[in-house]
Amino acid sequence: MKEFLAYIVKNLVDRPEEVHLKEVQGTNTIIYELTVAKGDIGKIIGKEGRTIKAIRTLLVSVASRDNVKVSLEIMEER
């Protein structure tokens, strides 16, 4: 699932080499922490959040077949 998410995100941004994805696992829960270049955050969020909602919907669909809850968080670069 991590590779699937990375593939989607890297094809949306201008700087795919700056895409970093961290997977934090809990009991039946996976949290993905996504970090992208500052200029690419808007592309990931999309107009009115539509792009990030679509990405999250895809993740939930893929995770549901494994009975796992999944969450995607966009982390701010420091």
From Swiss-Prot:
Its main location: cytoplasm. InterPro entries: KH_dom-like_a/b (IPR015946), KH_sf_prok-type (IPR009019), KhpA (IPR020627). It comes from the Bacteria. Residues 29-78 form the KH domain. Keywords: Cytoplasm, RNA-binding. Transmembrane segments: none annotated. The keyword Ribonucleoprotein does not apply. It is found in: Cytoplasm. Coiled coil: none annotated. It holds the Pfam family KH_KhpA-B. Belongs to the KhpA RNA-binding protein family. A probable RNA-binding protein. NCBIfam families: PRK01064.1 (NF002201). This is RNA-binding protein KhpA.
